[in-house]
């Protein structure tokens, strides 16, 4: 007799959720706690939210015999990362009224707000809905925010390629009306049974799913770290279609050798008319073959390695009724954002603003949040988020450029963006403490001060202008993509990090773990030694990551 597979709690909760409804309505009404019921916390993710608490105050509240200071993070779904000035103004106002006040630009080209109390969730969602923004499927075991090369100046065909981010996002949205019923008070027709979701059915995906689109030579989306990466193939000024990479993903678990980061495998080329169907069926294969018994091994990368690339590829071809063509030539040359003013083929202007670790706020005399509000009130610029946690003020007509420039100069944004060091411009950090429940160490609250101490070391070795990428996470889940940066710092315990080095600058190659459990002084000592060797022994314009990979110090 075949062995019956045990259903995990997560799978059971999804299956019995009645289309992601669960008991969320009752949980929200319970005024005796700032928390939701445990099952509802899982379902909440599918609505674009996480329950969190202030970890800085856990001990204090425990001594007073109070429950943890619970709050919620809301993440918006913004395919391709573009919103208008009206959206930004609404976001600014909601952040100030209902959250900590800081707008966090994420590594997946959207924004999230933290510190929202349970009673403020519905007002926040309704405020976003009033300007046609939502958080549907921004988290959970579904397709997440679809990312795309951010700067319109990257290609005359950017608008066409960007459009696919929205089309793919819409095609992979859950069909349930639960979001509208629970948060926006849409009337439920009790006598009408909701049809089964043809894509997600009643169990959704085994785990999160991420899709990115890149326009070579720009790889600002870190394409090969996604479950699906679409590489735009442009010839003679025409978009032909996409090379399709499958199976990227970075999350690992400390001490579990069965988990690992992986870059995507290029399956081949698909003409643009067929790309939506192929993407859809790549998702259905993962839905049907992905591991639902162990969430640590449930991402597509593990499914691909377990089944084999050829099996997975043939299954997609069979379901889509399409064969992959041979991959077409392409080349990535950079992952960095192109800061400052850039003009596109149509003559419009775009200004990339440096936003350290994606934190838009007014602090330490630098009023970035106020500056961006003033820009939004002109109604002369759109707002585009980058996967490097920066912001592009875009689609500015030539006649309006001086107006936007004057605001950037007035608030010091122009100066800040111009003066920041290359390594700081190429830094990324996840939220980590004090709100992320998975964090073992600091990230966004610590990386800026660590870079303060790294910059003099670079200067000592004549490397101040070297655009070395550095990324930090508070745990091994990889949200800031530390496993594919030239320097990756992965938290192991408070104040301690694993040091990873050796990825290339363009995003093709993973780094490797070099040293474990380093404190700050040890990190600086190790980097001092590596920078010294690099400065003396590099070949030509060889990048730091390529140098480390070449000299053979990594096992």
Curated annotation (Swiss-Prot):
This protein's UniProt keywords: 4Fe-4S, Amino-acid biosynthesis, Cysteine biosynthesis, Heme, Iron, Iron-sulfur, Metal-binding, NADP, Oxidoreductase
Enzyme Commission numbers on file: 1.8.1.2
Gene3D superfamilies for this protein: Sulfite Reductase Hemoprotein, domain 1
Reaction catalysed by this enzyme: hydrogen sulfide + 3 NADP(+) + 3 H2O = sulfite + 3 NADPH + 4 H(+)
Residues binding [4Fe-4S] cluster: 430, 436, 475, 479
CC cofactor: siroheme; [4Fe-4S] cluster
Family: Belongs to the nitrite and sulfite reductase 4Fe-4S domain family.
Function in brief: Component of the sulfite reductase complex that catalyzes the 6-electron reduction of sulfite to sulfide. This is one of several activities required for the biosynthesis of L-cysteine from sulfate.
Protein name per its UniProtKB record: Sulfite reductase [NADPH] hemoprotein beta-component
Species this protein is from: Leptospira biflexa serovar Patoc (strain Patoc 1 / ATCC 23582 / Paris)
